[in-house]
């Protein structure tokens, strides 16, 4: 018998028969094709990283060389523009960047005492004696004031009196040369009239070292010790001076500045950490890393010092710019950023460079203005703008575009006064931190 298929049920009236399978649309074809999302590249900095110019050969000063007492020559924006395109600007840039490149991936301890030349040892001894002068000019009692202590002027007077003998020890015998170098050296510890200190004074110290190079006393073989021993010792001396005399920040940008006083520790420090295998930019938020490596790397050491001088805990509250920079992917990006900042925020800022001093070893362009004697030497104690070019400027004391920045008391003073009153149990936390 042949089997028969079961009878199909009859379609109900008014109900359509099911459509054939071939007529059902493939909804998969109607869905948009999934493609990998293209990640947006971060905003690139249109400003190229400044290159290191070639460092010129030192001039022959053995005969027929006329030394000059350094003076201000950047008295207007026009003078500043001339400076920025001058050989001297390239000389300063080559000097600072050349020193930075000499310490790539090199910690402070890499330079041993046995590696130091006699001149480097003498310079370190001079800095030791400078620190000892602090005890001979103790700070005046100011009743808890956070503004600069006038006893600082006594320290600078003592440094000036010792300067000639110190330069004889270095090997500078010409009295005119000593006068030129002493001006840079004494101006590297701060301004006596305003009782302040900033990146311009720090730059004066580097120019003093540049003058020693121009005289043929310092050699390129001394570059590493110059940064890792001499400059590091200078930082230590300046921290003692800042904490003793409550030096006011020169042209401070407040919390929106990189640091109240220093810049070069960050530039040199980023170069030291350029290819470090495990210390990343985020490490500045790790107290143990700062404690263990702060003495080896200037960047970490400066962050640690900044933390110790604040009354509030947390970089994002007291140093938001440092906090922002720590999000960079690598030290290479930070190194490039610090180079840009040196050119733009130090050499490129008139409020900083109007105090720059030009002599014979670091000369001014002939077309720049001559100093009429109304510079820092003629500053009036109660007038922080004395001797400055105010043509076309609105000096209302606000914002970053004014001549001298924002005049603020020392943050170091606040921390030191709290310690004197026994309030050093720990830093305050922001309530919503």
From Swiss-Prot:
EC number: 5.2.1.8
Keywords: Cytoplasm, Isomerase, Rotamase
Chain spans, region Disordered: 1-67, 367-400
Name of the molecule in the record: Serine/threonine-protein phosphatase 2A activator 2
Species of origin: Gibberella zeae (strain ATCC MYA-4620 / CBS 123657 / FGSC 9075 / NRRL 31084 / PH-1)
InterPro entries, A to Z: Phstyr_phstse_ac, PTPA_C_lid, PTPA_sf
Claim: RNA-binding is one of the keywords in the record: no
Superkingdom assignment: Eukaryota
Basic and acidic residues bias (residue ranges): 383-396
Acidic residues biased stretches: 367-382
């Amino acid at each position: 018998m042949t089997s028969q298929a079961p009878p199909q049920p009859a379609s109900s009236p008014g109900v359509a028969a099911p459509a054939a399978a071939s007529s059902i649309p493939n909804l998969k074809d109607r869905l948009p094709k999934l493609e990998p999302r293209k990640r947006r590249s971060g905003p690139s900095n249109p400003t190229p990283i400044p290159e290191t110019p070639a460092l010129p050969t030192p001039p022959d000063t053995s005969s027929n060389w006329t030394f000059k007492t350094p003076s201000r020559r950047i008295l207007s924006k026009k003078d500043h523009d001339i400076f920025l395109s001058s050989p001297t600007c390239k000389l300063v840039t080559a000097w600072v960047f050349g020193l930075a490149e000499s310490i790539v991936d090199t910690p402070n301890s890499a330079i041993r005492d046995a590696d130091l030349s006699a001149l480097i040892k003498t310079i370190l001894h001079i800095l030791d004696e400078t620190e000892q002068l602090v005890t001979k000019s103790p700070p005046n009692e100011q009743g808890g004031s956070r503004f600069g202590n006038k006893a600082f002027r006594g320290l600078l007077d003592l440094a000036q009196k010792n300067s000639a003998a110190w330069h004889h020890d270095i090997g500078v015998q010409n009295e005119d040369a000593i006068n030129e170098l002493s001006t840079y050296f004494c101006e590297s510890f701060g301004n006596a009239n305003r009782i302040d200190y900033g990146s311009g004074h720090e730059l004066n110290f580097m120019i003093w070292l540049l003058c020693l190079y121009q005289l043929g006393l310092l050699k390129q073989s001394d570059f590493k010790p110059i940064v890792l021993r001499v400059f590091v010792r200078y930082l230590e001396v300046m921290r003692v001076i800042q904490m003793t005399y409550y030096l006011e920040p020169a042209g401070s940008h407040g919390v929106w500045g990189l640091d109240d006083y220093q810049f070069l520790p960050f530039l040199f420090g980023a170069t030291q950490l350029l290819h470090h295998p495990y210390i990343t930019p985020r490490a500045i938020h790790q107290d143990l890393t700062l404690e263990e490596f702060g003495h080896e790397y200037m960047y970490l050491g400066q962050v640690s010092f900044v933390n110790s001088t604040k009354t509030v805990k947390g970089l994002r509250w007291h140093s938001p710019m440092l906090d922002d920079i720590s999000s960079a992917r690598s030290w290479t990006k930070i190194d490039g950023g610090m180079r840009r900042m040196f050119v733009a925020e130090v050499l490129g800022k008139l409020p900083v460079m109007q105090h720059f001093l030009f002599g014979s070893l670091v000369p001014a362009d002939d077309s720049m203005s001559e100093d009429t004697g109304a510079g820092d030497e003629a500053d009036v104690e109660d007038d922080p703008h004395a001797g400055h070019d105010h043509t076309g400027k609105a000096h209302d004391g606000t914002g970053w575009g004014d001549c001298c920045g924002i005049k603020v008391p020392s943050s170091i003073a606040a921390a030191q006064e709290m310690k004197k009153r026994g309030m050093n149990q720990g830093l305050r936390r922001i309530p919503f931190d």
